[in-house]
């Protein structure tokens, strides 16, 4: 038997030519369903966005097949010449985009990028400070259920009860009392600008490293719509899929060569083996997009849209935590309406408005129920929505929440149908992926 005749026995006919629709109808149907969901519903989850077709193509490229342990020019595998090309492109574009000297583009996720920083700078049991989860922090900033809270000693700081802003006096007091090795500025549900300069002053006073996790607002930094954490931060981390509008992944940035070497060692071989080269290629594409002039307009529009949405939500009788927003997101406190975040998330989803339930500062409800929802504008802005559209969306959110307040978790079906019709009109006016 020849190799040619044996081939069908080791792979099915059409292995290199058959498209997903015929190769696996079940997975294909799920992907088509997700495409339709994204096309017909308005995405308001602050941590989600809509990538370009080019980013999707790079993510689904033949780099999926390639193993590339190590770094460009120093790989443990052969055949990495094109992997080196895309990784070097991603590195150089990230450095230019954020105005820093060193970039590691290999972290597979936001959690892994932050874990790599911990591995590079801390020893198990060392203390560090991060924004409390209940005040808008992230799991990797010291939550007791996360590795960061299990292997290290977290010292949480929070927001003030009266205005829901970070209490910098409390940050300074806690730092002086506990002498942490690391202080983290950044969060997942904080709508105001961070005082990077003050954080660095506090870090210097107690001899701590300053990490800025700008995962949520890095796209705004790239577009000049938010202050940069440089030169204040020793190290900056960011996911690449939120306001930066790239694939789901992470990066580590610094201006310090010695720290850069530590972070490289912490990512590989410390935390990861072979990087996801197809995702690195997509990061390079996204960074290239963010370097274009239109991205500055995009970033500015995200903030303008968020402010318009916050005002519209308030006009609809809802409360916005801290009174508004300086970035792309806001927390809406539903306590006065006696509506839970869980009920609002489900009701809004029935109305084709996708958001997530979220705890609000000093929330008395559990994280599985919550008293609030988190709203964001990056995905809608990518569609092409401007202030007018987001003012309409804010009013629609108010209508759905009022229906829940009247009727309980089942909501008002007639209102939700009317809102669905309005959402369908908006999505038809601003379509996405028309050729998919």
Curated annotation (Swiss-Prot):
Pfam families attached to this UniProt entry: SHMT
Entry binding sites for (6S)-5,6,7,8-tetrahydrofolate: 133, 137-139, 366-368
GO biological process, one term: tetrahydrofolate interconversion
GO CC annotation terms, alphabetical: cytosol
Molecular function as annotated in GO: glycine hydroxymethyltransferase activity; pyridoxal phosphate binding
Homology family: Belongs to the SHMT family.
Primary role: Catalyzes the reversible interconversion of serine and glycine with tetrahydrofolate (THF) serving as the one-carbon carrier. This reaction serves as the major source of one-carbon groups required for the biosynthesis of purines, thymidylate, methionine, and other important biomolecules. Also exhibits THF-independent aldolase activity toward beta-hydroxyamino acids, producing glycine and aldehydes, via a retro-aldol mechanism.
Assembly description: Homodimer.
Name this polypeptide is given: Serine hydroxymethyltransferase
Organism: Novosphingobium aromaticivorans (strain ATCC 700278 / DSM 12444 / CCUG 56034 / CIP 105152 / NBRC 16084 / F199)
The encoding gene: glyA
């Amino acid at each position: 038997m020849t190799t040619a005749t044996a081939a069908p026995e080791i792979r099915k006919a059409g292995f290199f030519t058959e498209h997903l629709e015929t190769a696996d109808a079940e997975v294909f149907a799920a992907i088509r369903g997700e495409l339709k969901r994204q096309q017909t519903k308005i995405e308001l989850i602050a941590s989600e966005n809509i990538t370009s077709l080019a980013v999707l193509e790079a993510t689904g490229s033949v780099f999926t097949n390639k193993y590339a342990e190590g770094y460009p020019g120093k790989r443990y595998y052969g055949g990495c010449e094109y992997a080196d090309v895309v990784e070097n492109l991603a590195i150089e574009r990230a450095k230019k985009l954020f105005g820093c000297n060193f970039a590691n583009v290999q972290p597979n996720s936001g959690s892994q990028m932050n874990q790599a920083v911990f591995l590079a700078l801390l020893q198990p049991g060392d203390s560090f400070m991060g924004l409390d989860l209940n005040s808008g922090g992230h799991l990797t900033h010291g939550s007791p259920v996360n590795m960061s809270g299990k292997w290290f000693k977290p010292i949480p700081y929070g927001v003030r009860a009266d205005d829901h802003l970070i209490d910098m006096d409390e940050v300074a007091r806690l730092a002086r009392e506990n002498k942490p090795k690391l202080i983290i500025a950044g969060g997942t549900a904080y709508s105001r600008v961070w005082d990077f300069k003050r954080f660095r002053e506090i870090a210097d006073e107690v001899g701590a490293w300053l990490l800025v996790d700008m995962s949520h607002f890095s796209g705004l930094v790239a577009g000049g719509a938010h202050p940069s954490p440089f030169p204040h931060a020793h190290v900056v981390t960011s996911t690449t899929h939120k306001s930066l509008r790239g694939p789901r992944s992470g990066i580590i940035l610094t201006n310090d060569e010695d720290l850069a070497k530590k972070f490289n060692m912490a990512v590989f071989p410390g935390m990861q083996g072979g990087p996801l080269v197809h995702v690195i290629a997509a990061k390079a594409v996204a960074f290239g997009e963010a370097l274009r002039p239109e991205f500055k307009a995009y970033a500015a529009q995200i903030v303008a849209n968020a402010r318009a949405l916050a005002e519209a939500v308030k006009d609809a009788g809802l409360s916005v935590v801290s009174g508004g927003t300086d970035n792309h997101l806001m927390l809406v406190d539903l306590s006065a309406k006696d509506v839970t975040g869980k009920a609002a998330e489900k009701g809004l989803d029935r109305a084709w408005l996708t958001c997530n339930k979220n705890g609000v500062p000093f929330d008395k409800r559990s994280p599985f129920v919550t008293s609030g929802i988190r709203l964001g504008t990056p995905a809608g802005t990518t569609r092409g929505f401007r202030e007018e559209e987001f003012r309409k969306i804010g009013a629609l959110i108010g209508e759905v929440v009022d229906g829940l307040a009247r009727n309980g978790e089942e909501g008002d079906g007639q209102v939700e149908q009317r809102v669905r019709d309005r959402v369908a009109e908006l999505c038809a006016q601003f379509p996405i992926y028309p050729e998919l």
